[in-house]
Amino acid sequence: MYPESTTGSPARLSLRQTGSPGMIYSTRYGSPKRQLQFYRNLGKSGLRVSCLGLGTWVTFGGQITDEMAEQLMTLAYDNGINLFDTAEVYAAGKAEVVLGNIIKKKGWRRSSLVITTKIFWGGKAETERGLSRKHIIEGLKASLERLQLEYVDVVFANRPDPNTPMEETVRAMTHVINQGMAMYWGTSRWSSMEIMEAYSVARQFNLTPPICEQAEYHMFQREKVEVQLPELFHKIGVGAMTWSPLACGIVSGKYDSGIPPYSRASLKGYQWLKDKILSEEGRRQQAKLKELQAIAERLGCTLPQLAIAWCLRNEGVSSVLLGASNADQLMENIGAIQVLPKLSSSIIHEIDSILGNKPYSKKDYRS
């Protein structure tokens, strides 16, 4: 799919300033020079997003200082990242406040940014959560106030709501778009059937269908993004924005000898992650990561870079959301772009053999 490096050293990124926000990436491998597709369409919409985005879950308004958050956003923006994702529930709304303050302080043109937020869990009251017309409209209004913005580019339904009729949710999403509070809407953690239902309702009543599903995707979770979402993309144009490329840090290799202090698994409220890492399955994953580490060394990159590049190599993925708690981590993650051209079919096959979890679609069984 991409040319392989002709040298043993890691591919070098050349950054050249252009009129557009941030920079354009191009990789050189002797000749001819070939430009990587750093910006991709979000699903079949016309919205152009950087293939890497910066997420704010756990970090903004929580794990890191506001100063560090500003440093990370600036670093991301200067390196061509235009997509910044948050949610009303992150740090009980504080993540949106921090994000909004940074955008205002930096004075970046709003038109150069793609800001996305998610609605479902708002306040403690019964009416302050879910996907009712009331909460979608009031929740997004409150989000925009915290962000100090007139609109977000994409508003996501943060999970399905079995207590609200699909037509009500789709009508409310269409309403906030028509009111100029959002440009597009998408889903997060919805099943293919639920997304298909939303699309059908939109078509039936001449409403706006969703353009994107936000899904967890990493080396140990593949089925949805590799089998289910491509079918939806071809049928109805829904794209994939993925999160947790390092499986909450598991794929980074930092947990290979236990739980280090200050890591996400050591935080209050993340006992589930700690249990996952220390489980039998967690130990098996760590053994596989040791084998993957050898491939990373051969390619001249780190394990996190290999894992992120592996997510990016999937053409059905519009953007991979990164989480970072310091500048070095973010720059390392952005460096995954350099690894992407080196993921030849033989390397991918080798990774699949180690993981042993490649999902198969119906058409694979037929062939």
From Swiss-Prot:
The keyword Membrane applies. GO terms for molecular function: aldo-keto reductase (NADPH) activity; methylglyoxal reductase (NADPH) (acetol producing) activity; potassium channel regulator activity; transmembrane transporter binding; voltage-gated potassium channel activity. The keyword Membrane applies. GO terms for cellular component: cytoplasmic side of plasma membrane; cytoskeleton; cytosol; juxtaparanode region of axon; membrane; pinceau fiber; plasma membrane; specific granule membrane. Phosphorylated by PRKCZ; may be regulated by incorporation in a complex composed of PRKCZ and SQSTM1. Its EC number is 1.1.1.-. NADP(+) binds at residues 56-57, 63, 85, 158, 188-189, 214, 243-248, 254, 262, 264, 323, 325, 329, 332-333. The modification Phosphoserine is found at residues 9, 14, 20, 31, 112. The modification N6-acetyllysine is found at residue 124. One of its GO terms (biological process) is regulation of protein localization to cell surface. InterPro entries: K_chnl_volt-dep_bsu_KCNAB, K_chnl_volt-dep_bsu_KCNAB-rel, K_chnl_volt-dep_bsu_KCNAB2, NADP_OxRdtase_dom, NADP_OxRdtase_dom_sf. It is a peripheral membrane protein. It comes from the Eukaryota. Detected in myelinated nerve fibers in the spinal cord, in the juxtaparanodal region of the nodes of Ranvier, but also in the paranodal region. Detected in hippocampus (at protein level). Detected in hippocampus. Keywords: Acetylation, Cell membrane, Cell projection, Cytoplasm, Cytoskeleton, Ion transport, Membrane, Methylation, NADP, Oxidoreductase, Phosphoprotein, Potassium, Potassium transport, Synapse, Synaptosome, Transport. It catalyses: hydroxyacetone + NADP(+) = methylglyoxal + NADPH + H(+); (E)-4-oxonon-2-en-1-ol + NADP(+) = (E)-4-oxonon-2-enal + NADPH + H(+). The modification Omega-N-methylarginine is found at residue 28. Its main location: cytoplasm. The modification Asymmetric dimethylarginine is found at residue 28. CDD domains: Aldo_ket_red_shaker. Belongs to the shaker potassium channel beta subunit family. Homotetramer. Interaction with tetrameric potassium channel alpha subunits gives rise to a heterooctamer. Identified in potassium channel complexes containing KCNA1, KCNA2, KCNA4, KCNA5, KCNA6, KCNAB1, KCNAB2 and KCND3. Interacts (in unphosphorylated form) with MAPRE1. Forms a ternary complex with SQSTM1 and PRKCZ. Regulatory subunit of the voltage-gated potassium (Kv) Shaker channels composed of pore-forming and potassium-conducting alpha subunits and of regulatory beta subunits. The beta-2/KCNAB2 cytoplasmic subunit promotes potassium channel closure via a mechanism that does not involve physical obstruction of the channel pore. Promotes the inactivation of Kv1.4/KCNA4 and Kv1.5/KCNA5 alpha subunit-containing channels. In contrast to KCNAB1, the shorter N-terminal domain of KCNAB2 cannot mediate closure of delayed rectifier potassium channels by physically obstructing the pore. This is Voltage-gated potassium channel subunit beta-2. It comes from Homo sapiens (Human). The lineage of its organism: Eukaryota, Metazoa, Chordata, Craniata, Vertebrata. The gene is KCNAB2.
